[in-house]
Curated annotation (Swiss-Prot):
This is Pachytene checkpoint protein 2 homolog. Keywords: Acetylation, ATP-binding, Differentiation, Meiosis, Nucleotide-binding, Oogenesis, Spermatogenesis. SUPFAM superfamilies: P-loop containing nucleoside triphosphate hydrolases (SSF52540). One of its GO terms (molecular function) is ATP binding. The gene is TRIP13. The keyword Acetylation applies. The lineage of its organism: Eukaryota, Metazoa, Chordata, Craniata, Vertebrata. Specifically interacts with the ligand binding domain of the thyroid receptor (TR). This interaction does not require the presence of thyroid hormone for its interaction. Interacts with proteasome subunit PSMA8; to participate in meiosis progression during spermatogenesis. The modification N-acetylmethionine is found at residue 1. One of its GO terms (cellular component) is nucleus. It comes from Canis lupus familiaris.
Length: 432
């Protein structure tokens, strides 16, 4: 127990101690090397680099042992609470090493038996999953959403380990992310589950992510829905009983619960619907007592979330469309990827927003392209993160159609793709 508490204390910020730097070590799937041997070699690598600038990643190694067994070594999450990368003196920091291997298996389906057919009630991943690798870094937000969520879950686990009386200080292990569609709520939940599984790899051998299909729960074919929901949560309970696993239960579009309850009250839905809602809430209350479970929920319609459910959520975080600054970061990551793949060629250095601010947004040969990207970002405000990530592909498909393109040509195409997106939205709204 003391060792587990120590792991959590290391993961949480502490004013009185040296700052903690988290280093994620991606062990190759084919590697059978011991984690302790890998950690020893990684510490030798870090000892040769006293100062790093923000997040940093090594993909190539001089050490033959690391080259054989490690895919990458990454200093991560140093920029969650600061606007810009800062120089980090590794010698003055506590280094937390997290060694992990990705599960290549993909999701499986959890089915519930009904009289006439089997209903897919949930999808199930073993974490960390290859499918979610890199997802955390791809999500860009203006406020400290990611750091707040990490700190919340780490505090939840610490309070549990310290046996804090939950009657005196209440916490439910329930997170609610709400906001318009396409803002990355579900992706953030999955990325958070992956990140925490890696962050707590010294304590839990693996993670389990169960994504419940809310719509299936209220299927018209469910003659005994309440009993079937209980069956599904019994499967989840079986996972929770394995104390080597950190279990995440994801309920997407949780407003479905509210819709069913309200419709039942209005007399438009059978009483079976209200039994399903009550069964889900009861089961949530039961599983949240366990220290190795976190319940993640999302909603697209904030006003329709049931008060009974909202009261259960410790964190109610609004996730809105990205600002121009966040859009700039999203586009910048897309351009970096296309330059790495040599679809945009030759490679050219783009300035960050902070660097543009430092030169007063003055246009010159160095800043010209970055200023154009900033302008495109501003006119992209109002588009969801989901759409923004598609636009580079659409820009190429609609306006380039060539194996390679210069960055100037690509930015022109991206600008046209943004204009087209707003034109299509205007046409759709006029038809409604």
């Amino acid at each position: 127990m003391d060792e587990a508490v120590g792991d959590l204390k290391q993961a949480l910020p502490c004013v009185a101690e040296a700052p903690t730097v988290h280093v994620e070590v991606h062990q190759r799937s084919c590697s059978t090397a011991k984690k302790e041997d890998i950690k020893l070699s990684v510490r030798k690598l870090l000892n040769r680099h006293n100062i790093v600038f923000g997040d940093y990643k090594w993909n190539e190694f001089d050490d033959p042992f690391l080259a054989r067994n490690v895919q990458s070594v990454s200093i991560v999450d140093t920029e969650l609470k600061v606007k810009d990368p800062q120089p980090i003196d590794l010698g003055a920091c506590t280094i937390a090493l997290h060694v992990f291997q990705l599960n290549e298996g993909g999701p499986s389906s959890e089915t519930l038996e009904e009289e006439t057919e089997n209903i897919t009630a949930a999808s199930h991943w073993v974490l960390p999953a290859a499918e979610f690798h890199g997802l955390w870094d791809s999500l860009v937000y203006d406020v400290e959403v990611k750091s707040h969520l990490l700190d919340y879950v780490m505090t939840t686990l610490l309070f549990s380990d310290k046996n804090v009386d939950s009657n005196l200080i209440a916490w439910n292990r329930v997170v609610l992310l709400h906001g318009p569609p396409g803002t990355g709520k579900t992706s953030l939940c999955k990325a958070l589950a992956q990140k925490l599984t890696i962050r707590l790899s010294s304590r839990y051998q693996y993670g389990q992510l169960i994504e419940i299909n809310s719509h299936s729960l209220f299927s018209k074919w469910f003659s005994e829905s309440g009993k079937l929901v209980t069956k599904m949560f019994q499967k989840i309970q079986d996972l929770i009983d394995d104390k080597d696993a950190l279990v995440f239960v994801l309920i997407d579009e949780v407003e479905s619960l509210t819709a069913a309850r309200n419709a039942c009250r209005a007399g438009t839905e059978p009483s079976d619907a209200i039994r399903v809602v009550n069964a889900v809430l009861t089961q949530i209350d039961q599983i949240k007592r366990h220290c190795n479970v976190v319940i993640l929920t999302t909603s697209n319609i904030t006003e329709r979330i049931d008060v009974a459910f909202v009261d259960r959520a410790d964190i109610r975080q609004y996730i809105g469309p990205p600002s121009a600054a966040a859009i700039f970061k999203i586009y910048l990551s897309c351009l970096e990827e296309l330059m790495k793949c040599q679809i945009i060629y030759p490679r050219q250095q783009l300035l960050t927003l902070r660097e543009l601010e430092m030169i007063g947004f003055i246009e010159n040969n160095v800043s010209k392209l970055s200023l154009l990207l900033s302008e495109i970002s501003r006119k992209s405000e109002g588009l969801s993160g989901r759409v923004l990530r598609k636009l580079p592909f659409l820009a190429h498909a609609l306006y380039i159609q060539a194996p390679t393109v210069t960055i100037e040509g690509f930015l022109q195409a991206l600008s046209l793709a943004v204009d087209k997106q707003f034109e299509e939205r205007k046409k759709l709204s006029s038809c409604i």
